[in-house]
């Protein structure tokens, strides 16, 4: 499972690094989480997690503060979550998570990304059953048994603990995120995470090769350019010539 997660992260890093609208995407999500759950990160654990994630992605503090202040003021737009799924280039499985204030616009934009890359958008449940909604933590280490013991003593419902090339990866149900993180940091307050998030981990991989590689890149770029798209998850392993 760890390798699949790492492959997805590598594939997404190239598009994430090219995001010109990353600040607005974070601002929108922080605003909605604060509006729905409260503006105090100590009381709103989802907000705390999102702020930590934004800071890790180098989102400036003023962007975060502005979104929270906007939520505290009670004014502003109402965004609702929307999820679309289907098959991308090469038959890979794709989940697209959005925040929107206009469902018609969003589905039109997302469907356009699928149709212009010979991909197929499906209905709810088309591919999501082939992903596990997981809390994922990775950090330097080589003793997975000791980590598992710490988590079990904290009564964490662990899915899996892996160790590969000096990196330990912990998988747990997404509902166990804070419990897992607290157990790990209480055991080692100096612990620094390479990965620390709630994500969708694919159960299988789809290798994308040949002409499908360029189409896949176009598909990812088009989705990243959609204002309403927040996250894209896929199970593609892209094999590029010369790599």
Swiss-Prot record:
Task: Show which residues constitute the signal peptide.
Answer: none
| Localization per record | Cytoplasm
Q: Does the keyword Transcription regulation apply?
A: yes
Q: Which superkingdom is the protein from?
A: Bacteria
What keywords would UniProt list here?
A: Cytoplasm, DNA-binding, Transcription, Transcription regulation
Q: Which GO terms describe its molecular function?
A: DNA binding
The record's Gene Ontology biological-process terms are: regulation of DNA-templated transcription
Q: What is its main location?
A: cytoplasm
The answer on whether this UniProt entry bears the keyword Membrane reads no
Recorded GO cellular component terms are: cytosol
Against Gene3D superfamilies, the record matches this protein to: 1.10.10.200, 3.30.70.980
- Quote the NCBIfam families the UniProt record gives: PRK12378.1 (NF009044)
Q: So what family is this one in?
A: Belongs to the TACO1 family.
Specify the protein name: Probable transcriptional regulatory protein Patl_0550
Source species of the chain: Pseudoalteromonas atlantica (strain T6c / ATCC BAA-1087)
């Amino acid at each position: 499972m760890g390798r699949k997660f790492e492959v997805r992260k590598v594939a997404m890093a190239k598009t994430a690094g090219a995001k010109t609208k990353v600040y607005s995407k974070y601002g929108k999500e922080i605003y909605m989480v604060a509006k729905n759950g409260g503006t105090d990160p100590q009381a709103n654990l989802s907000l705390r997690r999102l702020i930590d994630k934004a800071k890790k992605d180098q989102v400036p503090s003023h962007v975060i503060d502005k979104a929270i202040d906007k939520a505290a003021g009670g004014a502003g737009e109402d965004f609702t979550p929307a999820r679309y799924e289907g098959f991308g280039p090469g038959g890979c499985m794709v989940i697209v998570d959005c925040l929107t204030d206009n469902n018609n616009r969003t589905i039109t934009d997302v469907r356009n990304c699928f149709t212009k890359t010979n991909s197929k958008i499906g209905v709810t449940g088309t591919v999501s059953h082939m992903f596990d909604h997981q809390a994922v933590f990775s950090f330097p280490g080589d003793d997975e048994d000791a980590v598992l013991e710490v988590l079990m003593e904290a009564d964490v419902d662990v899915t899996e603990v892996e160790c590969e090339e000096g990196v330990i990866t912990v998988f747990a149900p997404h509902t166990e995120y804070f419990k897992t993180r607290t157990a790990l940091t209480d055991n080692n307050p100096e612990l620094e995470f390479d990965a620390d998030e709630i994500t969708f981990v694919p159960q299988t991989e789809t290798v994308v090769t040949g002409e499908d590689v360029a189409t896949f890149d176009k598909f990812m770029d088009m989705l990243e350019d959609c204002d309403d798209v927040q996250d894209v998850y896929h199970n593609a392993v892209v094999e590029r010539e010369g790599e």
